[in-house]
Amino acid sequence: MPPLWSFGYQQSHRTLASREEALDEAKMFRERKLPCDTLIYLGTGFCPSGWNTNNGEFGFNQKVFPDPKVMFDELHAEHFKVVLHVVIKSRSMHGIVRDTCDPKQPVEEQPSCYWDLHRDVFKLGVDGWWPDEGDPMNIASRLARNRMYWEGPQLDRPDERPFALHRNGYAGMQRYASFLWSGDVYSTWETLKVHVPIAINTGLTGIPYWGTDIGGFVPTKEFTAELYLRWFQFAAFCPLFRSHGRAWKLRLPWGWNTGDPGPAEINNYNGSALPGPDQLHNAQVEPICRKYLELRYRMLPYLYSAARECTTTGVPIMRALWLHYPDDPIAVARGDQFLWGSDILVAPVVEQGATLRQVYLPRGGWFDFWTNERHEGGQEILRKVDLETMPLYVRAGAILPLGPVKQYTGEQTDQPTNISIYPGADGTFLLYQDDGRSFKYRKGEWQGIEMAWRDASRTLTMRLAKGSRMLTGHGDRFEVKLGAAQKSMTFTGHPMEVKF
Protein backbone atom coordinates (compact mmCIF):
# COMPACT_ATOMS: atom_id res chain seq x y z
CA MET A 1 0.00 0.00 0.00
CA PRO A 2 1.25 3.52 -0.73
CA PRO A 3 0.94 6.07 2.08
CA LEU A 4 -2.46 7.73 2.33
CA TRP A 5 -1.00 11.19 1.75
CA SER A 6 0.15 10.18 -1.73
CA PHE A 7 -3.52 10.21 -2.81
CA GLY A 8 -3.94 13.84 -1.80
CA TYR A 9 -3.18 16.76 -4.08
CA GLN A 10 0.50 17.31 -4.95
CA GLN A 11 1.83 20.70 -6.04
CA SER A 12 5.11 20.87 -7.93
CA HIS A 13 7.40 23.91 -8.12
CA ARG A 14 10.07 25.01 -10.55
CA THR A 15 12.34 28.06 -10.23
CA LEU A 16 12.15 29.66 -6.79
CA ALA A 17 13.72 33.00 -5.99
CA SER A 18 14.01 32.58 -2.23
CA ARG A 19 13.09 30.69 0.90
CA GLU A 20 10.34 33.25 1.52
CA GLU A 21 8.74 32.59 -1.85
CA ALA A 22 8.66 28.85 -1.23
CA LEU A 23 7.04 29.26 2.19
CA ASP A 24 4.58 31.89 0.95
CA GLU A 25 3.32 29.59 -1.80
CA ALA A 26 2.79 26.84 0.78
CA LYS A 27 0.87 29.12 3.14
CA MET A 28 -1.42 30.24 0.33
CA PHE A 29 -2.95 26.76 0.17
CA ARG A 30 -3.95 26.92 3.82
CA GLU A 31 -5.11 30.54 3.69
CA ARG A 32 -7.24 29.96 0.60
CA LYS A 33 -8.64 26.66 1.93
CA LEU A 34 -7.34 24.68 -1.03
CA PRO A 35 -6.65 21.09 0.08
CA CYS A 36 -3.07 19.96 -0.51
CA ASP A 37 -0.82 17.30 0.98
CA THR A 38 2.48 17.47 -0.88
CA LEU A 39 4.94 20.08 -2.10
CA ILE A 40 7.42 18.92 -4.72
CA TYR A 41 10.66 20.77 -5.46
CA LEU A 42 12.45 20.46 -8.79
CA GLY A 43 16.23 20.22 -8.92
CA THR A 44 18.57 22.92 -10.21
CA GLY A 45 19.69 22.16 -13.75
CA PHE A 46 16.15 21.33 -14.80
CA CYS A 47 15.37 24.89 -13.74
CA PRO A 48 17.70 27.80 -12.87
CA SER A 49 17.01 27.70 -9.13
CA GLY A 50 15.71 24.46 -7.64
CA TRP A 51 16.26 22.71 -4.33
CA ASN A 52 19.85 21.53 -4.96
CA THR A 53 23.07 22.90 -6.41
CA ASN A 54 22.91 21.04 -9.75
CA ASN A 55 21.67 17.95 -11.56
CA GLY A 56 22.38 14.81 -9.59
CA GLU A 57 23.76 16.69 -6.58
CA PHE A 58 22.57 16.39 -2.99
CA GLY A 59 23.79 19.73 -1.67
CA PHE A 60 21.12 22.36 -1.06
CA ASN A 61 20.64 25.60 -2.96
CA GLN A 62 21.33 28.07 -0.16
CA LYS A 63 19.21 30.78 -1.74
CA VAL A 64 16.07 28.71 -1.30
CA PHE A 65 17.02 26.20 1.42
CA PRO A 66 19.58 27.96 3.64
CA ASP A 67 18.63 25.70 6.56
CA PRO A 68 16.72 22.77 5.05
CA LYS A 69 15.91 21.08 8.36
CA VAL A 70 14.26 24.23 9.70
CA MET A 71 12.36 24.72 6.47
CA PHE A 72 11.15 21.13 6.34
CA ASP A 73 10.01 21.46 9.94
CA GLU A 74 8.05 24.60 9.02
CA LEU A 75 6.37 22.84 6.11
CA HIS A 76 5.59 19.82 8.27
CA ALA A 77 4.05 22.12 10.87
CA GLU A 78 1.63 23.23 8.14
CA HIS A 79 0.96 19.52 7.43
CA PHE A 80 2.73 19.35 4.08
CA LYS A 81 4.87 16.45 2.89
CA VAL A 82 8.10 17.30 1.06
CA VAL A 83 9.19 15.49 -2.12
CA LEU A 84 12.50 16.20 -3.87
CA HIS A 85 13.39 15.73 -7.54
CA VAL A 86 16.49 13.62 -8.24
CA VAL A 87 18.28 12.95 -11.53
CA ILE A 88 20.44 9.94 -12.35
CA LYS A 89 23.15 10.14 -15.01
CA SER A 90 24.04 6.47 -15.17
CA ARG A 91 22.65 4.24 -17.91
CA SER A 92 22.79 1.14 -15.73
CA MET A 93 21.86 -0.05 -12.25
CA HIS A 94 22.03 -3.53 -10.80
CA GLY A 95 21.80 -5.10 -7.36
CA ILE A 96 19.87 -4.08 -4.23
CA VAL A 97 20.37 -1.61 -1.40
CA ARG A 98 21.59 -4.30 1.01
CA ASP A 99 24.50 -5.28 -1.20
CA THR A 100 28.02 -4.32 -0.17
CA CYS A 101 29.05 -1.08 -1.83
CA ASP A 102 31.98 -1.75 -4.18
CA PRO A 103 34.21 1.36 -4.32
CA LYS A 104 35.68 0.16 -7.61
CA GLN A 105 32.32 0.41 -9.39
CA PRO A 106 30.39 3.60 -10.36
CA VAL A 107 28.28 4.79 -7.44
CA GLU A 108 25.08 5.35 -9.43
CA GLU A 109 25.17 1.82 -10.81
CA GLN A 110 24.91 0.30 -7.33
CA PRO A 111 21.74 0.85 -5.29
CA SER A 112 23.70 0.33 -2.06
CA CYS A 113 26.13 3.13 -2.90
CA TYR A 114 23.64 5.41 -4.61
CA TRP A 115 21.09 5.28 -1.81
CA ASP A 116 23.82 6.30 0.63
CA LEU A 117 23.99 9.64 -1.23
CA HIS A 118 20.33 10.22 -0.38
CA ARG A 119 20.50 9.38 3.30
CA ASP A 120 21.77 12.63 4.80
CA VAL A 121 19.07 14.56 2.93
CA PHE A 122 16.44 11.99 3.84
CA LYS A 123 17.29 12.28 7.54
CA LEU A 124 16.46 15.99 7.43
CA GLY A 125 12.81 15.11 6.99
CA VAL A 126 12.23 14.53 3.28
CA ASP A 127 9.07 12.46 2.81
CA GLY A 128 9.46 11.18 -0.74
CA TRP A 129 11.41 11.26 -3.98
CA TRP A 130 10.83 12.11 -7.60
CA PRO A 131 13.38 10.03 -9.59
CA ASP A 132 13.62 11.66 -13.02
CA GLU A 133 15.52 10.73 -16.19
CA GLY A 134 16.89 7.20 -16.58
CA ASP A 135 15.34 6.76 -20.02
CA PRO A 136 18.47 5.07 -21.48
CA MET A 137 18.30 2.37 -18.80
CA ASN A 138 17.25 -1.12 -19.81
CA ILE A 139 14.32 -2.88 -18.16
CA ALA A 140 16.36 -4.59 -15.43
CA SER A 141 18.04 -1.31 -14.48
CA ARG A 142 14.74 0.55 -14.34
CA LEU A 143 13.27 -2.06 -12.03
CA ALA A 144 16.39 -1.97 -9.86
CA ARG A 145 15.88 1.78 -9.52
CA ASN A 146 12.19 1.36 -8.71
CA ARG A 147 13.15 -1.15 -6.04
CA MET A 148 15.86 1.07 -4.56
CA TYR A 149 13.35 3.86 -3.82
CA TRP A 150 11.12 1.35 -2.05
CA GLU A 151 13.72 -0.51 -0.01
CA GLY A 152 16.21 2.31 0.57
CA PRO A 153 13.92 4.54 2.66
CA GLN A 154 13.00 1.54 4.81
CA LEU A 155 16.62 1.21 5.94
CA ASP A 156 16.16 4.47 7.84
CA ARG A 157 12.41 4.38 8.50
CA PRO A 158 11.51 0.70 8.61
CA ASP A 159 7.86 1.17 9.51
CA GLU A 160 7.04 4.03 7.15
CA ARG A 161 5.68 3.45 3.67
CA PRO A 162 7.92 5.11 1.07
CA PHE A 163 6.76 7.29 -1.80
CA ALA A 164 8.49 7.68 -5.16
CA LEU A 165 7.21 9.19 -8.40
CA HIS A 166 9.10 7.63 -11.30
CA ARG A 167 9.67 8.78 -14.84
CA ASN A 168 9.94 5.21 -16.05
CA GLY A 169 9.82 1.58 -15.06
CA TYR A 170 8.26 -1.59 -16.40
CA ALA A 171 5.63 -4.20 -15.60
CA GLY A 172 6.48 -5.30 -12.08
CA MET A 173 7.22 -1.83 -10.71
CA GLN A 174 3.86 -1.97 -8.91
CA ARG A 175 5.35 -4.40 -6.38
CA TYR A 176 7.26 -1.37 -5.03
CA ALA A 177 4.14 0.86 -4.92
CA SER A 178 5.86 2.99 -7.57
CA PHE A 179 3.97 5.94 -8.98
CA LEU A 180 4.40 6.81 -12.65
CA TRP A 181 3.60 9.92 -14.63
CA SER A 182 3.18 10.40 -18.36
CA GLY A 183 6.26 12.57 -18.89
CA ASP A 184 6.92 15.97 -20.43
CA VAL A 185 3.85 16.29 -22.62
CA TYR A 186 2.58 19.33 -24.51
CA SER A 187 -0.35 21.46 -23.38
CA THR A 188 -2.84 20.65 -26.13
CA TRP A 189 -6.38 19.36 -26.32
CA GLU A 190 -5.24 16.35 -28.31
CA THR A 191 -2.75 15.47 -25.57
CA LEU A 192 -5.49 15.62 -22.94
CA LYS A 193 -7.74 13.48 -25.14
CA VAL A 194 -5.22 10.68 -25.62
CA HIS A 195 -4.37 10.63 -21.92
CA VAL A 196 -7.70 8.98 -21.12
CA PRO A 197 -6.90 5.72 -22.99
CA ILE A 198 -3.27 5.98 -21.85
CA ALA A 199 -4.50 5.99 -18.24
CA ILE A 200 -6.73 2.99 -18.87
CA ASN A 201 -4.02 1.00 -20.64
CA THR A 202 -1.41 1.78 -18.00
CA GLY A 203 -3.68 0.25 -15.38
CA LEU A 204 -4.23 -2.78 -17.58
CA THR A 205 -0.46 -3.38 -17.73
CA GLY A 206 -0.48 -3.80 -13.95
CA ILE A 207 0.76 -0.28 -13.12
CA PRO A 208 -2.08 1.27 -11.10
CA TYR A 209 -0.57 4.42 -9.59
CA TRP A 210 -0.46 6.78 -12.55
CA GLY A 211 -0.94 10.46 -13.27
CA THR A 212 0.09 13.35 -15.45
CA ASP A 213 1.31 16.94 -15.36
CA ILE A 214 -1.96 18.83 -14.99
CA GLY A 215 -2.28 21.17 -17.95
CA GLY A 216 0.61 19.53 -19.79
CA PHE A 217 4.29 20.21 -19.18
CA VAL A 218 5.09 22.46 -22.18
CA PRO A 219 2.74 25.43 -22.67
CA THR A 220 1.48 26.04 -26.20
CA LYS A 221 -0.95 28.50 -27.75
CA GLU A 222 -3.69 26.07 -26.64
CA PHE A 223 -2.72 26.42 -22.97
CA THR A 224 -5.70 28.32 -21.58
CA ALA A 225 -7.65 28.38 -18.35
CA GLU A 226 -10.23 26.13 -20.00
CA LEU A 227 -7.66 23.46 -20.90
CA TYR A 228 -6.11 23.66 -17.43
CA LEU A 229 -9.51 23.19 -15.76
CA ARG A 230 -10.55 20.26 -17.92
CA TRP A 231 -7.20 18.62 -17.22
CA PHE A 232 -7.55 19.37 -13.50
CA GLN A 233 -10.98 17.69 -13.45
CA PHE A 234 -9.60 14.59 -15.17
CA ALA A 235 -6.61 14.48 -12.81
CA ALA A 236 -8.88 14.58 -9.76
CA PHE A 237 -9.87 11.05 -10.81
CA CYS A 238 -6.37 9.74 -11.43
CA PRO A 239 -4.49 7.95 -8.62
CA LEU A 240 -1.76 10.62 -8.85
CA PHE A 241 -3.30 14.11 -8.55
CA ARG A 242 -0.42 16.46 -9.31
CA SER A 243 0.24 19.73 -11.11
CA HIS A 244 3.59 20.49 -12.76
CA GLY A 245 4.96 22.27 -15.79
CA ARG A 246 6.77 25.25 -17.23
CA ALA A 247 5.30 28.68 -16.60
CA TRP A 248 4.82 26.99 -13.27
CA LYS A 249 2.78 29.61 -11.42
CA LEU A 250 -0.08 28.82 -13.79
CA ARG A 251 -0.02 25.34 -12.23
CA LEU A 252 -1.18 26.80 -8.93
CA PRO A 253 -4.96 26.69 -8.46
CA TRP A 254 -5.01 30.47 -7.99
CA GLY A 255 -2.32 31.19 -10.58
CA TRP A 256 -4.68 32.10 -13.43
CA ASN A 257 -5.89 35.22 -11.63
CA THR A 258 -2.58 36.85 -10.66
CA GLY A 259 -1.25 38.10 -14.00
CA ASP A 260 2.02 36.25 -13.31
CA PRO A 261 2.80 33.00 -15.16
CA GLY A 262 6.14 32.68 -13.38
CA PRO A 263 9.44 32.03 -15.16
CA ALA A 264 8.59 30.90 -18.70
CA GLU A 265 11.47 28.44 -19.33
CA ILE A 266 10.08 27.41 -22.73
CA ASN A 267 12.79 28.47 -25.19
CA ASN A 268 14.01 24.95 -25.98
CA TYR A 269 10.64 23.57 -27.07
CA ASN A 270 9.21 23.80 -30.59
CA GLY A 271 5.67 25.11 -30.62
CA SER A 272 5.80 26.45 -27.07
CA ALA A 273 3.98 29.64 -26.15
CA LEU A 274 2.70 31.47 -23.10
CA PRO A 275 -0.98 32.32 -22.60
CA GLY A 276 -1.99 35.82 -23.63
CA PRO A 277 -2.58 38.52 -21.02
CA ASP A 278 -6.34 38.07 -21.42
CA GLN A 279 -5.99 34.59 -19.89
CA LEU A 280 -4.14 35.68 -16.76
CA HIS A 281 -6.97 37.36 -14.87
CA ASN A 282 -9.57 34.61 -14.75
CA ALA A 283 -11.45 34.50 -11.46
CA GLN A 284 -13.32 31.30 -12.43
CA VAL A 285 -10.36 28.97 -12.11
CA GLU A 286 -9.71 28.94 -8.37
CA PRO A 287 -13.27 28.12 -7.22
CA ILE A 288 -13.58 25.34 -9.81
CA CYS A 289 -10.24 23.90 -8.69
CA ARG A 290 -11.44 24.11 -5.09
CA LYS A 291 -14.61 22.21 -6.03
CA TYR A 292 -12.61 19.29 -7.43
CA LEU A 293 -9.99 19.39 -4.68
CA GLU A 294 -12.70 19.14 -2.06
CA LEU A 295 -14.43 16.37 -3.99
CA ARG A 296 -11.17 14.42 -4.22
CA TYR A 297 -10.68 14.65 -0.47
CA ARG A 298 -14.30 13.73 0.22
CA MET A 299 -13.84 10.64 -1.93
CA LEU A 300 -10.69 9.48 -0.16
CA PRO A 301 -12.52 6.71 1.77
CA TYR A 302 -13.69 5.31 -1.57
CA LEU A 303 -10.31 5.81 -3.27
CA TYR A 304 -8.26 4.31 -0.42
CA SER A 305 -10.57 1.29 -0.35
CA ALA A 306 -10.01 0.90 -4.10
CA ALA A 307 -6.25 1.08 -3.48
CA ARG A 308 -6.60 -1.75 -0.96
CA GLU A 309 -8.50 -3.80 -3.55
CA CYS A 310 -5.74 -3.04 -6.05
CA THR A 311 -3.10 -4.20 -3.55
CA THR A 312 -4.83 -7.50 -2.85
CA THR A 313 -6.18 -8.36 -6.33
CA GLY A 314 -4.20 -6.33 -8.87
CA VAL A 315 -7.36 -4.75 -10.29
CA PRO A 316 -6.49 -1.11 -11.12
CA ILE A 317 -8.25 1.93 -9.71
CA MET A 318 -8.88 3.43 -13.17
CA ARG A 319 -10.66 0.67 -15.06
CA ALA A 320 -11.64 0.03 -18.65
CA LEU A 321 -15.39 -0.42 -18.91
CA TRP A 322 -14.90 -3.92 -20.27
CA LEU A 323 -13.35 -5.12 -17.00
CA HIS A 324 -16.86 -5.03 -15.56
CA TYR A 325 -18.86 -5.32 -18.79
CA PRO A 326 -16.85 -7.76 -20.96
CA ASP A 327 -19.88 -8.92 -22.94
CA ASP A 328 -20.91 -5.39 -23.94
CA PRO A 329 -19.29 -4.57 -27.32
CA ILE A 330 -19.85 -0.83 -26.93
CA ALA A 331 -18.23 -0.84 -23.48
CA VAL A 332 -15.32 -2.85 -24.88
CA ALA A 333 -14.77 -0.26 -27.62
CA ARG A 334 -14.95 2.84 -25.40
CA GLY A 335 -11.63 4.41 -24.49
CA ASP A 336 -12.81 7.94 -23.72
CA GLN A 337 -14.37 7.17 -20.33
CA PHE A 338 -13.53 4.84 -17.47
CA LEU A 339 -14.64 3.39 -14.18
CA TRP A 340 -13.07 4.70 -10.99
CA GLY A 341 -13.27 1.71 -8.75
CA SER A 342 -16.29 -0.42 -9.58
CA ASP A 343 -19.07 2.10 -9.00
CA ILE A 344 -18.19 5.51 -10.49
CA LEU A 345 -18.13 6.22 -14.21
CA VAL A 346 -15.96 9.18 -15.25
CA ALA A 347 -16.36 10.93 -18.61
CA PRO A 348 -13.64 13.60 -18.98
CA VAL A 349 -14.42 16.60 -21.17
CA VAL A 350 -11.61 16.75 -23.74
CA GLU A 351 -13.01 19.03 -26.47
CA GLN A 352 -12.40 22.77 -26.48
CA GLY A 353 -15.56 24.81 -25.95
CA ALA A 354 -17.68 21.73 -25.26
CA THR A 355 -21.23 22.29 -24.04
CA LEU A 356 -22.31 18.65 -24.46
CA ARG A 357 -20.59 15.36 -23.61
CA GLN A 358 -21.74 12.07 -25.11
CA VAL A 359 -21.57 9.35 -22.46
CA TYR A 360 -22.19 5.63 -22.78
CA LEU A 361 -23.83 4.01 -19.76
CA PRO A 362 -23.47 0.21 -19.58
CA ARG A 363 -26.38 -1.99 -18.56
CA GLY A 364 -28.16 -1.35 -15.28
CA GLY A 365 -29.19 1.89 -13.66
CA TRP A 366 -26.95 4.95 -13.30
CA PHE A 367 -27.31 8.13 -11.26
CA ASP A 368 -25.87 11.49 -12.26
CA PHE A 369 -23.55 12.33 -9.35
CA TRP A 370 -24.27 16.06 -9.59
CA THR A 371 -28.07 16.01 -10.01
CA ASN A 372 -29.03 12.51 -8.78
CA GLU A 373 -31.06 12.02 -11.97
CA ARG A 374 -31.47 8.34 -12.80
CA HIS A 375 -30.77 6.89 -16.25
CA GLU A 376 -31.22 3.42 -17.65
CA GLY A 377 -28.02 1.86 -18.92
CA GLY A 378 -27.30 0.25 -22.24
CA GLN A 379 -27.53 3.56 -24.07
CA GLU A 380 -25.70 6.71 -25.10
CA ILE A 381 -26.81 9.96 -23.49
CA LEU A 382 -25.90 13.60 -24.05
CA ARG A 383 -24.92 15.43 -20.87
CA LYS A 384 -24.87 19.22 -20.82
CA VAL A 385 -21.56 20.50 -19.46
CA ASP A 386 -20.51 23.94 -18.33
CA LEU A 387 -16.93 24.79 -17.42
CA GLU A 388 -17.21 23.44 -13.89
CA THR A 389 -18.90 20.15 -14.77
CA MET A 390 -17.26 16.85 -15.68
CA PRO A 391 -19.87 14.08 -16.03
CA LEU A 392 -19.83 11.52 -13.23
CA TYR A 393 -22.28 8.65 -12.86
CA VAL A 394 -22.80 6.25 -9.96
CA ARG A 395 -23.96 2.70 -10.52
CA ALA A 396 -27.33 1.62 -9.13
CA GLY A 397 -26.61 -0.57 -6.11
CA ALA A 398 -23.52 1.42 -5.19
CA ILE A 399 -22.65 2.20 -1.58
CA LEU A 400 -20.57 5.37 -1.78
CA PRO A 401 -18.63 6.62 1.28
CA LEU A 402 -17.92 10.35 1.27
CA GLY A 403 -15.82 11.81 4.06
CA PRO A 404 -15.78 15.41 5.26
CA VAL A 405 -13.76 18.02 3.39
CA LYS A 406 -10.20 18.10 4.71
CA GLN A 407 -7.27 20.41 4.00
CA TYR A 408 -4.87 17.44 4.14
CA THR A 409 -5.39 13.71 4.43
CA GLY A 410 -4.29 13.47 8.06
CA GLU A 411 -6.54 16.25 9.34
CA GLN A 412 -8.54 15.10 12.36
CA THR A 413 -12.27 15.73 12.40
CA ASP A 414 -15.26 14.59 14.42
CA GLN A 415 -17.58 14.84 11.44
CA PRO A 416 -19.22 11.60 10.31
CA THR A 417 -18.68 9.84 7.01
CA ASN A 418 -21.65 9.99 4.66
CA ILE A 419 -22.76 6.70 3.17
CA SER A 420 -24.87 7.35 0.07
CA ILE A 421 -27.02 4.50 -1.20
CA TYR A 422 -27.92 4.45 -4.88
CA PRO A 423 -30.98 2.19 -5.14
CA GLY A 424 -32.18 -0.02 -7.95
CA ALA A 425 -29.98 -3.05 -7.37
CA ASP A 426 -28.24 -4.96 -4.60
CA GLY A 427 -24.69 -3.92 -3.81
CA THR A 428 -21.70 -4.42 -1.53
CA PHE A 429 -18.72 -2.34 -0.47
CA LEU A 430 -15.70 -2.92 1.77
CA LEU A 431 -14.70 0.30 3.54
CA TYR A 432 -10.99 -0.09 4.29
CA GLN A 433 -9.01 1.94 6.85
CA ASP A 434 -5.59 1.73 8.45
CA ASP A 435 -3.16 4.25 9.91
CA GLY A 436 -2.20 5.38 6.39
CA ARG A 437 1.51 5.45 7.22
CA SER A 438 2.98 2.20 8.47
CA PHE A 439 3.13 -1.48 7.55
CA LYS A 440 1.05 -2.52 10.56
CA TYR A 441 -1.81 -3.44 8.25
CA ARG A 442 0.30 -6.45 7.23
CA LYS A 443 -0.01 -7.68 10.81
CA GLY A 444 -3.77 -7.29 10.98
CA GLU A 445 -3.89 -3.65 12.09
CA TRP A 446 -6.61 -2.61 9.69
CA GLN A 447 -10.31 -1.97 9.89
CA GLY A 448 -12.67 -3.24 7.24
CA ILE A 449 -16.40 -2.66 7.34
CA GLU A 450 -18.37 -4.89 4.99
CA MET A 451 -21.51 -3.16 3.81
CA ALA A 452 -24.34 -4.80 1.90
CA TRP A 453 -27.43 -3.14 0.43
CA ARG A 454 -30.53 -5.25 -0.15
CA ASP A 455 -32.71 -3.29 -2.50
CA ALA A 456 -35.95 -5.23 -2.10
CA SER A 457 -36.00 -4.76 1.68
CA ARG A 458 -34.34 -1.32 1.62
CA THR A 459 -31.82 -2.53 4.17
CA LEU A 460 -28.14 -1.77 4.69
CA THR A 461 -26.13 -4.18 6.84
CA MET A 462 -22.66 -3.62 8.27
CA ARG A 463 -20.23 -6.02 9.85
CA LEU A 464 -16.54 -6.18 10.63
CA ALA A 465 -14.57 -7.81 7.82
CA LYS A 466 -12.88 -11.11 8.55
CA GLY A 467 -9.25 -10.62 9.60
CA SER A 468 -9.71 -6.98 10.55
CA ARG A 469 -10.27 -5.26 13.87
CA MET A 470 -11.75 -2.04 15.19
CA LEU A 471 -9.13 0.70 15.28
CA THR A 472 -9.27 3.69 17.58
CA GLY A 473 -9.28 7.09 15.95
CA HIS A 474 -10.93 5.89 12.75
CA GLY A 475 -14.31 6.89 11.44
CA ASP A 476 -17.12 4.83 12.89
CA ARG A 477 -19.88 7.45 12.83
CA PHE A 478 -21.99 7.45 9.70
CA GLU A 479 -24.82 9.39 8.12
CA VAL A 480 -26.54 6.88 5.85
CA LYS A 481 -28.46 8.53 3.02
CA LEU A 482 -31.06 7.14 0.64
CA GLY A 483 -32.38 9.98 -1.47
CA ALA A 484 -33.76 12.60 0.92
CA ALA A 485 -33.91 10.14 3.84
CA GLN A 486 -31.01 10.10 6.28
CA LYS A 487 -30.18 8.06 9.37
CA SER A 488 -27.32 8.45 11.85
CA MET A 489 -25.48 5.45 13.25
CA THR A 490 -22.34 4.47 15.09
CA PHE A 491 -20.59 1.26 14.12
CA THR A 492 -19.14 -0.57 17.13
CA GLY A 493 -17.79 -3.69 15.48
CA HIS A 494 -20.95 -5.72 15.92
CA PRO A 495 -23.28 -6.50 13.00
CA MET A 496 -25.73 -3.66 12.44
CA GLU A 497 -28.70 -2.97 10.21
CA VAL A 498 -30.19 0.25 8.86
CA LYS A 499 -33.64 -0.02 7.34
CA PHE A 500 -35.39 2.60 5.21
What are these regions (language model features)?
Residues 1-389, 394-395:
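Catalytic-domain carbohydrate-binding cleft regions of carbohydrate-active enzymes
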